[in-house]
Amino acid sequence: MYGVILDKIDYEPKLIIRDIDDRFQYKISYAKAWRAKQKVFEMRFGTYEASYDNLPHMLSAIVQRNPGSAADTYIVPSLDGGPGFLLRAFFCLGACVRAFMYCLPVLCIDGTFLTGRYKGTILTAIGVDCNKQVVPIAFAFVENENTESWYWFLERVKIHQ
């Protein structure tokens, strides 16, 4: 079932229940099917926690592989001297920054809330080209939409434009 679940990203727990019953004549609960799907994704892609831990490394790889790209993180130090925790992450791709030179001289900014396991806000800066097409410029993951996080984001957008 591991391969089937991976092949069908939108494989719903109710379909897992049906397929287990058809294949093995065994009934499982919805909760068990949900946990099985989560476990398969963790085995293949890692945990949510590991993804957040790897974010600074992934951003570094983006900057190294994409000329003109930029990234920054804000990590809050731990009180006990251990590793801190990621509070904010910013990135912009070099190609998008260069494309902004050909956009209308207006920068549109917006934020939207994350509603999954980890809360927070995604802040975005976009431009509009002469064909009225949206050009993404920069993104940031922040703790919430407040004056301090907006200032942090816009300061980085200004530096990297």
Where are the regions a protein language model picked out?
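DNA-binding interface regions
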Residues: 1-161
